[in-house]
Swiss-Prot record:
It is a multi-pass membrane protein. It comes from the Archaea. The chain crosses the membrane at residues 21-43, 53-75. This is Uncharacterized protein AF_1455. It comes from Archaeoglobus fulgidus (strain ATCC 49558 / DSM 4304 / JCM 9628 / NBRC 100126 / VC-16). It is found in: Cell membrane.
């Protein structure tokens, strides 16, 4: 699962943002990922009594899997060039 996240972050980091369409597309995609992750998290937290704790652990991993790449996409959309100083994103 961790390798999937790092692969996704590398792909986000390699997007050429010199084009404004790519820049705004990444901002919208990042906002949608965060929004869907938080909406899904609130919904699952409201029905946690029905599904139980083992199910909630998997759902929380899924939520983190949406919110962290979304936040990174929004952060990356503020920079035109890739972030090369982060070791695992090279």
């Amino acid at each position: 699962m961790l390798s999937l996240y790092t692969r996704l972050l590398r792909r986000i980091n390699r997007i050429d943002l010199r084009d404004d369409l790519n820049l705004w597309g990444l901002r919208i995609a990042g906002g949608l990922m965060i929004g869907v992750g938080l909406l899904f998290g609130v919904f699952m937290a409201s029905v946690s009594a029905v599904f139980g704790e083992p199910f909630m652990l998997g759902i929380s991993i899924l939520i983190v899997g949406l919110v962290i790449p979304g936040a990174f996409a929004l952060f990356r959309s503020t920079r035109r060039y890739p972030i090369v100083h982060i070791g695992f994103l090279k």
